[in-house]
UniProtKB/Swiss-Prot annotation:
Stretches in topological domain Extracellular: 1-24, 79-99, 158-195, 260-271
Compartment annotation: Cell membrane
Taxon lineage: Eukaryota, Metazoa, Chordata, Craniata, Vertebrata
Keywords tagged on the record: Cell membrane, G-protein coupled receptor, Glycoprotein, Membrane, Olfaction, Receptor, Sensory transduction, Transducer, Transmembrane, Transmembrane helix
Transmembrane regions: 25-48, 57-78, 100-119, 139-157, 196-218, 236-259, 272-291
Membrane topology, as annotated: Multi-pass membrane protein
Main location, first listed in the record: membrane
Protein name from the UniProt record: Olfactory receptor-like protein OLF1
Native source organism of the sequence: Canis lupus familiaris (Dog)
Length: 311
């Protein structure tokens, strides 16, 4: 690299380059989706916190999953909404670092929480007599603390290595937020270490969580198949239905990100995938756990009745 370069102090987020009238339409669509994310996840957290019937480890984990979803989207969507209405789509170097750090931290935290939820279901179904001992309040809190520590440590590694790089002259990020792959393309220094970290350390977090989930469900399935009555098998496995659906959507998306062939790495493909896991999944999770869970539906009905009776 020669000495004739200018260090970048801010980036331009290209976002979704379309006609101005379509920008307004996209703004309204994503604003509506973000409103659903806020309402759904905050509503679910409040319901779990206030309803005495939902004070179990499973719902404690679910409440933290909703919090991680909410924070993950909130690290990205507000800036994206502002950029739809503004001609100035810039973000400072430090702002970009913060956005990337928090989005990466909460994404990885969510993976760890989903793994903890799978372990919780394993203990509940395979060792029901020891459930209250194994999944005590203290253990549950530690699992959540470790999930947040794991997510933040992973993010700290990626953020530190990404922002010690020099960015010269080119400053247009072909994305709607500061994500690592499009950011690395702008660096004027060697990014081989970052690319190695992304493909090994980054994927190892998801692979570890995926392995925990697969092993947990292997033992769950073995226990369920030992139940003689079909109604008993169905009732037992139904307690995992919401979690399995959530895992299939989230981990399926991440597995596609890490396993897709190189010819599928295009900016537009990345944007579509990013919209799915930053916005669509946080919209779907509260719906999945509300519509497919009898306890949550009953708690919602009790909350509505209480509100009606008190008014």
């Amino acid at each position: 690299m020669d000495g004739n370069y200018t260090l970048v102090t801010e980036f331009i987020l290209l976002g979704f380059p379309t006609r101005p009238e379509l920008q307004i339409v996209l703004f309204l669509v994503f604003l509506t989706l973000y409103g659903i994310i806020l309402t759904g996840n905050i509503g679910l957290m409040m319901l779990i916190r206030t309803d005495p019937h939902l004070q179990t480890p499973m719902y404690f984990f679910l409440s933290n999953l909703s919090f991680a979803d909410l924070c993950f989207s909130s690290a990205i969507v507000p800036k994206m909404l502002v950029n739809f209405l503004s001609e100035n789509k810039s973000i400072s170097l430090y702002g970009c670092a913060l956005q990337f750090y928090f989005s990466c931290a909460f994404a990885d935290t969510e993976s760890f929480i989903l793994a903890a939820m799978a372990y919780d279901r394993y203990v509940a179904i395979c060792n029901p007599l020891l459930y209250t001992v194994v999944m005590s309040r203290g253990i549950c809190v530690w699992l959540i603390v470790l999930s947040y520590i794991g997510g933040n440590m992973s993010s700290l590694v990626h953020t530190s290595f990404a922002f010690i790089l020099k960015y010269c002259d080119k400053n247009v990020i072909n994305h709607f937020f500061c994500d690592l792959p499009p950011l690395l393309k702008l660096s004027c220094t060697d990014t081989s270490v970052n690319e190695w970290l992304l493909s090994t350390y980054g994927s190892s977090v998801e692979i570890f969580c995926f392995i925990v989930i697969v092993i947990s469900y292997y033992f769950i399935l073995r226990s369920v198949l030992r139940i003689r009555s079909s109604s008993g098998r169905k009732k037992t496995f139904s307690t995992c239905a919401s979690h399995l659906t959530s895992v299939a959507i989230y981990q399926g998306t991440l597995l596609f990100i890490y396993s897709r062939p190189t010819y599928l790495y295009t900016p537009n493909t990345d944007k579509i995938i990013s919209v799915f896991y930053t916005i669509i999944i946080p919209v779907l999770n509260p719906l999945i756990y509300s519509l497919r869970n009898k306890d949550v539906k009953d708690a919602a009905k009790r909350a509505v009745r209480l509100k009606v009776d008190s008014s």
